[in-house]
Amino acid sequence: MELMVKGAAALTVSETTFGREFNEALVHQVVVAYAAGARQGTRAQKTRSEVSGGGAKPWRQKGTGRARAGTIRSPIWRSGGVTFAAKPQDHSLKVNKKMYRGALKSILSELVRQDRLIVVEDFSIEAPKTKELVAKLKELELNDVLIVTGEVDENLFLAARNLYKVDARDVAGIDPVSLVAFNKVLMTAAAVKQVEEMLA
């Protein structure tokens, strides 16, 4: 199949990478797993056995008229432990390489079908200036966009850093979440070829 390249000849690409049927269940599974893997999972609370103090019985068992109590760190008490205390946990989910690649292919194919993937011969700016990047994106009528280049472009990354709904990455930095998060994906011809090789 062929991808249209702005201001250049069409690019021949693999049908299996850019023309595959959309697998919603797979994409959902991989996106959820990717987001889950980004969770810190460091929350921690203390149970009654972990809270400092509470070793001595506050008052004797019988004869005071008060409710019986064995520790001042009971979950019922103020400053007591937490009944079902949250503990650090690993939220990451297992995703096979085949599934991950399949999801990326599915997303890229859907972007092509929805005319959300724009391919250009080259995309760079002379200086790390946000103003320059804004002007260049305005020419292409883009504002909510992920820019993917074949190699690391320091100027582009620095200029995009301060823009809302604009991100610049090299091919190694793309992931399922970033591909679905933006309205458009702008790729250089070199990046398209690299993605194709990566997912072959």
Curated annotation (Swiss-Prot):
One of its GO terms (biological process) is translation. The keyword tRNA-binding does not apply. GO terms for cellular component: ribonucleoprotein complex; ribosome. Residues 43-65 are annotated as: Disordered. It comes from the Bacteria. GO terms for molecular function: rRNA binding; structural constituent of ribosome. Keywords: Ribonucleoprotein, Ribosomal protein, RNA-binding, rRNA-binding. InterPro entries: Ribosomal_uL4, Ribosomal_uL4-like, Ribosomal_uL4_dom_sf. It holds the Pfam family Ribosomal_L4. Belongs to the universal ribosomal protein uL4 family. PANTHER family: 50S RIBOSOMAL PROTEIN L4, LARGE RIBOSOMAL SUBUNIT PROTEIN UL4M. One of the primary rRNA binding proteins, this protein initially binds near the 5'-end of the 23S rRNA. It is important during the early stages of 50S assembly. It makes multiple contacts with different domains of the 23S rRNA in the assembled 50S subunit and ribosome. Forms part of the polypeptide exit tunnel. Part of the 50S ribosomal subunit. This is Large ribosomal subunit protein uL4. It comes from Aliivibrio salmonicida (strain LFI1238) (Vibrio salmonicida (strain LFI1238)). The lineage of its organism: Bacteria, Pseudomonadati, Pseudomonadota, Gammaproteobacteria, Vibrionales.
